[in-house]
A protein has these predicted regions:
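NAD(P)-binding Rossmann-fold cofactor-contacting core
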Residues: 60-80
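Rossmann-like adenosine-cofactor binding region
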Residues: 83-153
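Phosphate/diphosphate ligand-binding glycine-rich loop within oxidoreductases
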Residues: 1-31
Length: 154
């Protein structure tokens, strides 16, 4: 996968592994109880790349990636070679997604919230996953709960 999120030292050697992929896979398999075809992934950093790899391994048909950072968008499109991904930083293509994933720092304590157009999508979404861990109940999770949309995160 070529993405490391944790380093371990053993017998004077350093090993890297990826907890983002494993952690997301557990949440996804616990929460998502039906096939999903259209996913909105918010973010384009290291965690988002791990999640993209998982989604590709699961053979998801369509993933729209929404990112505010043009440089990360360029890096992501250059390093992740999948044909079912659409990347934009200005608009969201669909009004309905089976799953919305926040893999950005938006909503994290001390950071900006997600763009308001994201929250408007929640009532028409089947599942929400927000990987932000502080606070555990982000505005996205609270919006999902208020609309009775199954959700998980952290």
């Amino acid at each position: 996968m070529k993405i490391i999120s944790r380093l371990n030292k053993k017998n004077k050697n350093v090993y890297g592994d990826n907890t983002d992929y494993i952690g997301f896979a557990k949440i996804y398999k616990k929460l998502v109880k039906k096939n999903v075809n259209k996913i909105l992934l918010i973010g384009a950093g290291g965690a988002a790349r791990s999640i993209l790899q998982f989604l590709n391994d699961e053979k998801i048909k369509q993933v729209d990636i929404f990112t505010r950072t043009l440089n990360k968008k360029k890096i992501l499109s250059r390093t992740m070679k999948f044909d079912n991904f659409y990347i934009d930083s200005k608009e969201i293509r669909n009004k309905h997604y089976d799953l919305i994933i926040n893999a950005s720092d938006a909503g994290m304590l001390g950071r900006k919230n997600l763009a308001s157009n994201i929250y408007k999508l929640v009532p028409n979404t089947s599942f929400i996953i927000d990987i932000v861990y502080n606070p555990l109940r982000t505005n996205l999770i609270e919006t999902a709960r208020a609309n009775n949309v199954p959700n998980d995160g952290g």
